[in-house]
Structures are given as C-alpha cells and as structure tokens.
Amino acid sequence: STAFISQYIRLLYPAILNYTNGVMITDIDMLPMNNTYYSKHIEDYDNNKFIYLRDVLIHTDNQIAMCYNVATSKTWQDIFHIHSIQDINTSLINRFKSIDFVEGTSNSCWFTDQIELYNHVQSWNERTHNFVYLNDKITGYSRLDRIHMNTHTLDETLKTKIKSGVFSDYHCLRPYSQYKNMNDMIYHTL
C-alpha cells in the first residue's frame, strides 16, 4: 500500500540520513508558518533528546502525532533499530503484514504510524530518559486550520496574522487540486 508506506517510512528514513543536527518529521499537508516555533523551543536541548513539539494525543490516545518530532539520525536509529535501506524495507514489509491496513482515514490502522512512534519512543525512553514533549500553551502553538476558514478568500486581517507569524502552521485544504489557489495564496503570503 502506497498510503501505508508514505505514512510509516517517515519513522524509519530519518535514521539513515547523514545529518548531525535534528531531523524533523511532519505530514505532507502541513505548512510551517513561522520559524521561531520550530527552533526557539528546542535550542536548549542537547542532541540526545527526542523532542515532540506538541502535547496532543500522548495522554489521551497513546499516540505521538507525526507533527512535529525532531531528533538526530542517531537517535532515530536507536529508537527504530534502522541502519540501512534494507532495514527500512524489512520493517515496512513486516509491519504491513502484521496489520489489516485499508486505504482511507476511517480504518483503525490509519494511525499505525502514530501508535508505533509512541510505543517505540516510550520503550526507548525507559532506557535513556531522553524523551521531551513540549506544552502547546507554553510554546504558543497556533494552527491556521482548514476546518475554520473561508475556502475562497483571504481577508486582510488573516494576511496580517500570517505575515506576522501568529500561526505555527497551516493545515492545507485538500484535495490540493481543488484548493490550489487558496493554498498557494496562503503560501505566497508567508
């Protein structure tokens, strides 16, 4: 399943990147909207930490949302035991065979990646005590959400908020082909 692979590979691929600083994962339909949110709140942590920039789902659903997690490649390796492309392939195949994944967000397996991230990070944290999650109220997290917006116009007040970095991210309207103009307008307002 291409949907399963595109979701699950985000957990594994950071482990094989040749990069010394943090690698952040997210969703493809999320648009970062201010650079302070993604850097300011993590700069005091050392490179041994796995940092979850949100505090949603962790206490209610035993999940860690894909947005936004940052750790070094070495930490991703340690959490998921991934050291090569072959390890990624093997992990993808084994995990896919162990679930009843059906395309679409209504299937319970849709959240396999977030549940797996939670379980692996919790297990790793028992050994290392290096898991950090940040509080949305303290970080000032604020999403421009597609659910609460006019899908045809971008008023001046909203443009001003976007330009001044009020929002941490934008959850893009989809499908992109239908909402291309609005998504592009928001992107170009940044």
Model-derived regions: residue spans:
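Glycine/small-residue-rich pyrophosphate-binding loop that anchors the diphosphate of NDP-sugar donors
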Residues: 5, 65-69, 108, 113
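Catalytic-loop motifs flanking and including active-site residues across diverse enzymes
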Residues: 6-10, 62, 113-117
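GT-A fold catalytic core of metal-dependent nucleotide-sugar glycosyltransferases
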Residues: 6-54
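Short loop segments at secondary-structure junctions
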Residues: 17-20, 72-76
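Short catalytic/ligand-binding loop motif for oxyanion handling, primarily in non-cytosolic enzymes
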Residues: 32-35, 40-41, 58-65, 77-78, ...
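Short beta-strand-to-loop element that shapes/binds the nucleotide-sugar donor at the catalytic cleft/hinge
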Residues: 46-74
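Catalytic core and acceptor-binding pocket of nucleotide-sugar-dependent glycosyltransferases
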Residues: 75-190
